[in-house]
A protein has these predicted regions:
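Residue signature of alpha-solenoid helical repeat architecture, marking inter-repeat boundaries
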Residues: 75, 113-117, 155, 193-195, ...
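Compositionally biased alpha-helical segments
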Residues: 25-151, 155-166, 170, 188-189, ...
């Protein structure tokens, strides 16, 4: 090999390495989706995001990803603390995520999309902690609402709307919840499943507000949907459970029990434990309306012991069990249920109910 040829090859290799290893070549955004958790790499332009989808330039080819399929987005300029916090949030380790986020000053973050993520995760984590372990719900709602109103084109928009609705319910502001769950919030999402989820959430909020006729209508709308996929069908089953509870609350507990027993008989607890938690809670409430405290206790106990993955349903079960154990002569068990409720779900509205 001649000296000139060798020199040319070396120069070419160095130039190639410089391109490959340069920050501009290495710095890429990554969209992680439900179908490709390894990530889709490219560059998201400043105007590449809406509440419904995110566009990314992948080697000259622009692809669009629906927001409801996105697990998370990692940006090229992410601070390491944000990378950790984002992963911790996905894993629902909110306390550790909060610790990481506390190290980041949003004012020092230059890229707007990264700054949006910092602001969102700071507010979202505080909201989740306020709803579960405790904290100032009003402050958490205020912080998240600032993000919600300032960044309506963020792909986090609908998640923020749902969480704000949950916070509103937790502080008894059902009027505010209606807005967050409604057409300007979660219910305005372009995906049918999100609309069903919004209707279900609104129905549950109306139950807590004592507006059982309105709640029943909300549940009927969801249950009567023509959507037919696994997620939609699951949401419709949950709506039927809500409808059954409304029957009990409006003087028809026998009808409610028949519907709920049918739900339990026809579904698999291994596939949807949360449905069974809601169903057994609703059965418990039906039995309470029939003045059958022992039957009610056994229903709520099933949620506590077998179907506790739905934190809201579990909190309700513990709240009802605390009273029922006392009423059935087991004050020690009542104290145990009350303590468990306060330790695990001090942020839940059920923890403050008398």
């Amino acid at each position: 090999m001649s000296f000139s040829t060798r020199s040319l090859l070396i120069a070419t290799a160095v130039a190639f390495a410089a391109v490959v290893l340069s920050p501009s070549a290495q710095a890429q955004d990554i969209i992680y989706t439900l179908t490709k958790k390894a990530g889709n790499r490219g560059n998201i332009p400043p105007d590449g995001m809406t509440a419904a989808e995110v566009s990314i330039d992948m080697a000259g080819v622009v692809r669009k990803f629906p927001a409801n399929e996105i697990i998370k987005i990692a940006y090229a300029e992410d601070p390491s603390e944000l990378v950790s916090a984002r992963n911790l949030t996905v894993d629902k380790n909110y306390n550790s995520a909060k610790d990481q986020l506390a190290k980041i000053d949003p004012a020092k973050v230059e890229r707007d999309l990264v700054k949006q993520d910092v602001i969102f995760y700071k507010a979202f984590v505080e909201a989740k902690l306020a709803l579960t372990e405790g904290g100032n719900k009003s402050d958490a709602a205020s912080a998240l609402n600032k993000f919600y109103t300032k960044y309506p084109k963020s792909y986090h928009f609908y998640e923020a709307a749902e969480t704000l609705g949950d916070l509103s319910v937790a502080i008894g502001r059902f009027d505010l919840a209606a807005g967050y769950y409604g057409d300007t919030g979660l219910g305005g999402a372009p995906w049918p499943e999100y609309k069903l989820k919004a209707g279900l959430a609104m129905g549950r909020a109306l139950v807590l507000a004592g507006k059982f006729d309105d709640a029943s209508k909300a549940f009927e709308t969801v249950a009567g949907s023509g959507e037919n996929n696994s997620e939609a069908n699951a949401l419709k089953q949950h709506a039927i459970v809500g409808k059954a509870q409304c029957l009990a609350e409006t003087g028809k507990p026998d009808e409610g029990i028949a519907i709920l027993n049918d739900i339990v008989a026809k579904n698999d607890p291994q596939l949807d434990g949360k449905l069974f938690a809601r169903a057994y809670n609703a059965l418990g409430n039906c039995y309470l309306k029939q003045s059958k405290p022992k039957d009610a206790l056994m229903s709520f106990l099933k949620t506590d012991l077998l179907f506790f993955t739905d934190s809201d349903a579990h909190a309700e079960a513990l709240s009802k069990l605390a009273k029922l154990w006392d009423e059935t002569g087991h004050a020690d068990r009542g104290t145990e249920a009350r303590n468990k409720l306060r330790e695990r779900y001090s942020g839940s509205a059920w923890a403050t109910k008398p």
